[in-house]
């Protein structure tokens, strides 16, 4: 009995000590290899130093393909803190016949060698004779089981506490059964790892994620928003949707079991976030305003354009239906790109445009005809609805511009002064439709030639008469013209107009880019 108890206690101490040392990592360097080094502009081979938070563990990883018994290495390098890599000194893939092999390990250069040993189920033969157990066996068993159970609970609790944010271990994308839509070949079966939540909304949330050596955005929809996810995927998959001013699409995925399914949309990641978030924290110069506004207009103009005869097919005209500053993202150089096509309509010849239910989008940005429920269900009518919302976004930009000879307003969404933060549909109908009010264009904005031109353009975008509104192409040309004709030198305290041009002939309203 004494010997059994000592043995059980020793096993318990070993189990607890293994949990106590979690979090240590001795991985400082890993073998580096990138098969796509020319495209990614990296070294092809070398040694990579691993960096990370002190309380995080670091690992090495390797991915490879086995084609006709030939090993083709895809990537090797450092890997982030990952439960699946803990205490693995050898880089071994154990999954049964994966398309792309992936392994991770701990220890310097441990990914120099990698191997594939699939786990196999071992069945015990039933014909073996049962040997009598020694009398102390049951005593030892009864002593060990409770202690091991306690040790297991302690270890599991520690793991859950320390890694509760790592809800998604690294996975190979696309999955074997993504369901409709089909898996995206652009992902190339690369390891994808979620890092942090960047935004939450009615659709779900947006994660910053790592796809090998680059950051991407992963928009995760709950299953009840499947229609929005499906619509975004279909719009992004149309011919000709690769454009500098439209958010870059990478892939769409269906994750989880039939009981608990999440829908993923993977796009390029932009650290500056949305135009709305940027304007909350920053003011903009005249040149910055013009650059953001022009690139936003070019993105919307391209979206609205019907382009036949492209190499990959016919790009139809597309109405966004939810243009707002939250759905305009900014690249590092402040180039704008249009995002979020969950409500978009595509106008393909001979096909239905889809759900043309009138009152969709964000109330604050709804055009008068949408608020009235008096939409003409034709293509041009939907494009003009986008232009009304674009006028409001341009107003947001103007309200944060330092070029005007007056104070810069605190950032506000459109109609906050008139209605407040949470307008009802009835509030919007009263102010926009019946009273025909719009956000205030400050008098001192009009004193500057360029800002005066911008204010005129804004008013023509949000005109109550939908047919009188400017096209996105015309807005882009006007802003280019404004910037060219108005040369402004700004300092911290002075705005000097060097060239003022009046009586300018603007491009026609239906001009396209």
Swiss-Prot record:
Q: Which GO terms describe its cellular component?
A: activin receptor complex; plasma membrane
Q: Does the keyword Lipid metabolism apply?
A: no
Does Disulfide bond appear among the keywords? yes
Q: How does it sit in the membrane?
A: Single-pass type I membrane protein
Q: What class of enzyme is it?
A: transferase
Instruction: Read off the InterPro entries from this record.
Output: Kinase-like_dom_sf, Prot_kinase_dom, Ser/Thr_kinase_AS, Snake_toxin-like_sf, TGFB_receptor
Q: Carbohydrate attachment sites? A: 43, 66
Q: Which PROSITE patterns match?
A: PROTEIN_KINASE_DOM, PROTEIN_KINASE_ST
State the Gene Ontology terms under molecular function.
activin binding; activin receptor activity; ATP binding; BMP receptor activity; metal ion binding
EC no.?
2.7.11.30
Q: Which UniProt keywords apply?
A: ATP-binding, Cell membrane, Disulfide bond, Glycoprotein, Kinase, Magnesium, Manganese, Membrane, Metal-binding, Nucleotide-binding, Receptor, Serine/threonine-protein kinase, Signal, Transferase, Transmembrane, Transmembrane helix
What catalytic activity is recorded? Answer: L-threonyl-[receptor-protein] + ATP = O-phospho-L-threonyl-[receptor-protein] + ADP + H(+); L-seryl-[receptor-protein] + ATP = O-phospho-L-seryl-[receptor-protein] + ADP + H(+)
**Which residues does the record give as ATP binding sites?**
198-206, 219
Q: Give one Pfam family.
A: Pkinase
Q: Which residues cross the membrane?
A: 136-161
Q: What is its main location?
A: membrane
Q: Which domain of life is it from?
A: Eukaryota
- Active site: residue positions: 322
Domain Protein kinase stretches: 192-485
Which PANTHER family does the UniProt record give? ACTIVIN RECEPTOR TYPE-2A, TRANSFORMING GROWTH FACTOR-BETA RECEPTOR TYPE I AND II
Q: Which family does it belong to?
A: Belongs to the protein kinase superfamily. TKL Ser/Thr protein kinase family. TGFB receptor subfamily.
The protein's assembly and partners:
Part of a complex consisting of MAGI2/ARIP1, ACVR2A, ACVR1B and SMAD3. Interacts with MAGI2/ARIP1. Interacts with type I receptor ACVR1. Interacts with TSC22D1/TSC-22. Interacts with activin A/INHBA.
Q: Please report the name of this protein according to its UniProt entry.
A: Activin receptor type-2A
This protein's species is Ovis aries
Lineage in the entry?
Answer: Eukaryota, Metazoa, Chordata, Craniata, Vertebrata
């Amino acid at each position: 009995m004494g010997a059994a108890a000592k043995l059980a206690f020793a096993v318990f101490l070993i189990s607890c000590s293994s949990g106590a040392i979690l979090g240590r990592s001795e991985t400082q360097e890993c073998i580096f290899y990138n098969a796509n080094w020319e495209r990614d502009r990296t070294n092809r081979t070398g040694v990579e130093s691993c960096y990370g938070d002190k309380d995080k563990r670091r690992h090495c990883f390797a991915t490879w393909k086995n084609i006709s018994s030939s090993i083709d290495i895809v990537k090797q390098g450092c890997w982030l803190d990952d439960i699946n890599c803990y205490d693995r000194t050898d880089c071994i893939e154990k999954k049964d016949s994966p398309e792309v092999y992936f392994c991770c390990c701990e220890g310097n250069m441990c990914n120099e060698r990698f191997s594939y040993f699939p786990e196999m189920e071992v069945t015990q033969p039933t014909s073996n004779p049962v040997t009598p157990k020694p009398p102390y066996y049951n005593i030892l068993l009864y002593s060990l089981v409770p202690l091991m159970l306690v040790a297991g609970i302690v270890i599991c609790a520690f793991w859950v506490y320390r890694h509760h944010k790592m809800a998604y271990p690294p996975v190979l994308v696309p999955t074997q059964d993504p369901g409709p839509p089909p898996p995206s070949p652009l992902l190339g079966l690369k390891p994808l790892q979620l890092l942090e939540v960047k935004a939450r909304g009615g659709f779900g949330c947006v994660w910053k994620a790592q796809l090998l050596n680059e950051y991407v955005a992963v928009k995760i929809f709950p299953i009840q928003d499947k229609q929005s996810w499906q619509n975004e995927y279909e719009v992004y998959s149309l011919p000709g949707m690769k454009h500098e001013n439209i958010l870059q699409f990478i892939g769409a995925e269906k994750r989880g079991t039939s009981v608990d399914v999440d829908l993923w949309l993977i796009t390029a990641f932009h650290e500056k976030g949305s135009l709305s978030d940027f304007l909350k924290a920053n003011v903009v110069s005249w040149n910055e305003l013009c650059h953001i506004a022009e690139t936003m207009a070019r993105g919307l103009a391209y979206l609205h354009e019907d382009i036949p005869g492209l190499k990959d097919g016919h790009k139809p005209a597309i109405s966004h239906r939810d243009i707002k500053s939250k759905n305009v993202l900014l690249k590092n150089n402040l180039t704008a790109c249009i995002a979020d096509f969950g409500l978009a309509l595509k106008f393909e010849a001979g096909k239905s445009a889809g759900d043309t239910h009138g009152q969709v989008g964000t109330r604050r940005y709804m055009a008068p005809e949408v608020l009235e429920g008096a939409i003409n269900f034709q293509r041009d009518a939907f494009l003009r609805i986008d232009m009304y919302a674009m006028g409001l976004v341009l107003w947001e930009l103007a309200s944060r511009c330092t070029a005007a000879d007056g104070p810069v307003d605190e950032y506000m969404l459109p109609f906050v002064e008139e209605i407040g933060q949470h307008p009802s549909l009835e509030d919007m109908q009263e102010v926009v439709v019946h009273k025909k009010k719009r956000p205030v264009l400050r008098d001192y904005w009009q004193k500057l030639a360029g800002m005066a031109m911008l204010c005129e353009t804004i008013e023509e975008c949000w005109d109550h008469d939908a047919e009188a509104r400017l096209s996105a192409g015309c807005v882009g040309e006007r802003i280019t013209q404004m910037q060219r004709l108005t040369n402004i030198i700004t300092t911290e305290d002075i705005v000097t107009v060097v060239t003022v041009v009046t009586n300018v002939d603007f491009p026609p309203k239906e001009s396209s880019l």
